[in-house]
Regions:
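A secondary-structure micro-motif
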Residues: 1-213
């Protein structure tokens, strides 16, 4: 897309990875001295990995998509439906929740960043939808999502530059999340329209600003 065409990237290597079910992070070998900033999106050849949440002069800490306190607004590449994907605490799966029963979402659909919330540029691969099933309320559907990025195996990553995101916040620094409102936005919109989305609460470090599970 035109938005992606304006982006620059910066290479970094993974120093350490933490895949505890309650904490999914990367430690990179580049920090403030290399121009790394809190809020930068991190990708690999497959797709989105997460976002920088802290830096030192020589390192950066990345909150992975799979962290249970993380969520990212997405759009279904095929239909444009806008939904939210949550971290599951597992490096091999994300959680798609609050899918309306009538939503045009199918197993195998590719999910892309929608750009809503201002944290990530639109159009980056997030994952692939698995089997849809009713959630506990029976009023919505949910599904596991296979991440597009190799979150547990990559040695080198790319940090996006040339995009001004809403900074991420370390979940440990956040106040308790409010009770989420039921339902999820499901307006049918073209993915390309996400390049200029309406104002929306940030899903930053996912405080359940987006509808919760």
């Amino acid at each position: 897309s035109a938005e992606r065409g304006r982006l620059d990237v910066q290479l970094a290597s993974v120093l350490d990875i933490d895949l505890d079910p309650t904490r999914q992070r990367l430690l990179l070998d580049s920090g403030r001295n290399a121009g790394v900033q809190v809020g930068q999106a991190v990708i690999d050849a497959g797709g989105l990995m997460g976002q920088v949440i802290a830096t030192t002069p020589s390192t950066a800490s990345v909150l992975l998509l799979t962290d249970p306190d993380h969520a990212v607004p997405v759009a279904v590449a095929r239909s444009g439906i806008r939904l939210v994907v949550y971290g599951s605490g597992r490096s091999d799966a994300l959680h798609l929740a609050d899918v309306p029963l009538s939503a045009d979402v199918r197993p195998g659909d590719e999910l892309l960043t929608s750009g809503l919330g201002g944290r990530f540029p639109p159009g980056f691969a997030v994952g692939t939808v698995g089997t849809l099933r009713p959630d506990d309320s029976r009023a919505f559907l949910e599904a596991d999502v296979t991440p597009a990025a190799q979150l547990d195996r990559g040695r080198d990553v790319l940090l996006l530059r040339g995009y001004k995101p809403v900074p991420a916040v370390d979940p440990a620094a956040l106040p308790p999340a409010p009770v989420p409102a039921p339902g999820a936005p499901a307006a049918v919109q073209a993915v390309s329209a996400a390049t200029n989305p309406p104002a929306s609460p940030s899903a930053t470090a996912t405080t359940r600003s987006e509808p919760g599970r």
